[in-house]
Amino acid sequence: MVPTRNRPMLRILGFFICAAFIYLSFRDLWLNHKGKAKLGFVKRNGTQFVVDDKPLYVNGWNSYWFMDHAVDEHSRNLVGEMLEAGAKMGLTVCRTWAFNDGGYNALQISPGRFDERVFQALDHVIAEARKHDVRLLLSLVNNLQAYGGKTQYVKWAWQEGVGLSSSNDSFFFDPSIRNYFKNYLKVLLTRKNSVTGIEYRNDPTIFAWELINEPRCTTDVSGKTLQDWIDEMTGFIKSIDDKHLLTVGLEGFYGPNSPKGLTVNPEQWASQLGTDFVQNSNSSNIDFASVHIYPDHWFHNQTFEEKLKFVVKWMQSHIEDGLKELKKPVLFTEFGLSNQNKDYEPSQRDKFYRIIFDVVYKSAKRKKSGAGTLVWQLFMEGMETFNDDFGIVPHEQDSIYKLMIEQSCRLGKVTGRLKEQKLKELCSHRH
């Protein structure tokens, strides 16, 4: 039994022990989220990305599945594990979906109705990225049907009796649907992160916003419909958030308004999609251009070597456009080689990656507009069902793993960032 005279002292001691425990428990969380509040926003200086007035060339990846996995507590850990794996390779930017419209684990259940549980999952993704010093390129809607996309918006309009057309492309011209999307944008941009306490529009963890993944508007091949939509939506975004960079999310095809580029397109069909790389990227509120690289999807009868030649020509054309026409950075936001090709060999993927990395590295050395690449896609062990023939698990293909680290080191040398501790350690042990 404790003597009565000692009880006040024990209470005081207990209080300080409890306070110390709470401090130690939450110190790392506080440092990870609050202590990095001075992280600089990525900006644009001509054809270069800059952070704190220093050039930034991107070596990154795609993991579109982050928010979806963060909803479930049993799979949430995969987000942090993937970000940690990326950071250990010196990767600096991850592109992921900030949308899920209708369907399972929907962020937006119906126009203007959001699932707080899913929003908190996205909060977690952003907080984890901040923790691992990785920035996020967040895509805002899908042109494809996966995760809802423009098709879901059109369905909503029809269900509410306000749709003008059953065409999926009415997403771009229907006033009611435009208002649906604007409402979503406003809610997302002004969202206060439940983990960090920072509004999305004020969070430098977000590298940039991507307006739409792979837009196409085949009902108007002139490109006017899509261009009007881009101009309106980018202006709306900038009126709410003028701190973050903004890109369209293009595949990079040239339209009728860019006759010189038509010879660079993979085939004639690419000019009939209602998009135009130069015109769309030249919109005044667009800060950098985006391009994809998928010769497997775009050609059916070419040999592997012919595809490699196309890739170099494709990339160089867009880099020159960025330098001379747009005067903006060009980021290759998706690239991949399918392992389901006839006569596929793992060494082909090595060659494919090497050529793409080399083009960007040479552009960076010459201070041209090639601003970086994002591999499609990376995932973790046990996620084979998410592999769309392009996916890679870090470490499983050692040659690719080493190529990605080498690119991080090469770009770090160009920018002078090799002196930064994490990159210095990574690159000094590379050999």
Curated annotation (Swiss-Prot):
GO terms for biological process: polysaccharide catabolic process; seed germination. It holds the Pfam family Cellulase. Its EC number is 3.2.1.78. Glycans are attached at N45, N168, N282, N301. Residues 1-24 form the signal peptide. It catalyses: Random hydrolysis of (1->4)-beta-D-mannosidic linkages in mannans, galactomannans and glucomannans. This is Mannan endo-1,4-beta-mannosidase 5. It comes from Arabidopsis thaliana. The gene is MAN5.
